[in-house]
From Swiss-Prot:
Single annotated GO MF: unfolded protein binding
Protein name (Swiss-Prot/TrEMBL): Protein GrpE
Subunit structure: Homodimer.
InterPro entries named among the record's database cross-references: GrpE (IPR000740), GrpE_coiled_coil (IPR013805), GrpE_head (IPR009012)
Keywords: Chaperone, Cytoplasm, Stress response
Gene3D superfamilies membership: 3.90.20.20, Head domain of nucleotide exchange factor GrpE (2.30.22.10)
Source organism of this protein record: Thermotoga petrophila (strain ATCC BAA-488 / DSM 13995 / JCM 10881 / RKU-1)
Gene Ontology cellular component list: cytoplasm
Length: 172
């Protein structure tokens, strides 16, 4: 083998090594892209399932509301009442395991979680205090699906006579 052939083979070998490195890097990038793609597809699938569950749970909330109304009307010692109460608790438990939470009404009215359906004039409590829950509210994975319908305390309005005093007629 001549010196020229050796140089050509060495050069060709170097070129092949370089090409191998390029292909190896390309394969690594493809593998990383594929892993990222798999993770993204899995994330999208979880989000799709969550959204489908949200839709279903949103449709079931009125059923919970009806159960609550029935329980509030029923005789507490009646066997039928106890049966309905048991079904309500089971349904609520299943939905809570899927991410539904009842909005717990705090001391103050929160427009993001409550819907005021009635204003009650009173001086007995601080203004904008939630006095009563008319209909429960719910969140699904932290997102408000249905605000709680509540009665809110407001300051009593002053009587018109106290607010505006009529000026007396002056005769000249």
């Amino acid at each position: 083998m001549s010196e020229k052939d050796k140089k050509e083979l060495t050069q060709e070998c170097e070129e092949l090594k370089e090409k191998y490195k390029e292909l190896e890097e390309y394969a690594k990038r493809l593998k990383a892209e594929y892993e990222n793609y798999r993770e993204e597809v899995a994330r999208e699938k979880r989000e799709l399932i969550k959204n489908a569950n949200e839709y279903l749970i949103l449709k079931l909330i009125p059923v919970l509301d009806d159960f609550e109304r029935a329980l509030n009307q029923g005789e507490k010692r009646d066997a039928f009442y106890e049966g309905v109460k048991m079904i309500y608790k089971k349904l609520l438990n299943v939905l809570e395991k899927e991410g539904l939470t009842k909005i717990h009404v705090g001391e103050k009215f929160d427009p993001f979680e409550h819907e005021a359906v009635e204003r009650v004039e009173t001086e007995d409590v601080e203004e904008y205090t939630v006095l009563e829950v008319v209909e429960s509210g719910y969140k699904f994975h932290g997102k408000v699906l249905k605000p709680a319908k509540v009665k809110v305390a407001v300051k009593p309005r002053k009587k018109e006579a106290e607010k505006v005093e009529k000026p007396s007629d002056e005769k000249e």
